[in-house]
Amino acid sequence: MVNKSFVWCKIPRAGLGNQLFPIANALFFAKEKNLPIYFTHYRQFKLGPYLRRERTKRKYDNFFTFDRGLIYDIYLRILLRYKSRKMSKVKGCGSISANTVYLFDEIPSWEGYFNSIVNDREEVKKLLFQNINSDILEQVKTLSKPIFSLHIRLGDFQII
């Protein structure tokens, strides 16, 4: 019998930094288990930046190679949602079952924020860079390197 399992990364509504966690975990899991991977919910309209009249609107269209446009995203959402397969939210990197959809759709909690990727940092970094569009990478190369950058929002972490 043929194993028709695959990985589905349903990108959560969050900022780009928080979206990178399920993306990175899904990419790593799919590579480790040699499974096909599908990404949905990448194109998200965020009303807040418009209401607050922010200069940047937080649109990350075409940043990644898996972003194939809104129509394809909607088509894939419908197709994946109605597949009659067992759905499994991934909590580790254990063994895989036949005909299972491995779903990555959550941002890690504050207490284990980096636990899922810390031991495989270099591989995860490599996988992320492989999935960034070449145009974006070229733009990044032209920028001067920052000396230091830090962004912490207290809404993302519990005060200890």
What are these regions (language model features)?
Residues I23, N34, L51-R53:
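General "foldedness" signal
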Residues V2-R13:
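Nucleotide-activated donor-dependent transferases that construct or modify glycoconjugates
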Residues K46-I160:
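Secretory-pathway luminal glycosyltransferase catalytic domains
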Residues K10-P12, T40-H41, I152:
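Short His-Asn-centered micro-motif
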Residues I11-F21, I159-I160:
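A short, glycine/small-residue-rich beta-strand->loop->alpha-helix junction that serves as a flexible
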Residues L20-K31:
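Histidine-anchored nucleotide/phosphate-binding helix
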Residues S5, K31-I37:
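Short helix-capping/linker segments at secondary-structure and domain boundaries
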Residues L35-F45:
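A short beta-strand-loop structural module common to alpha/beta enzyme folds
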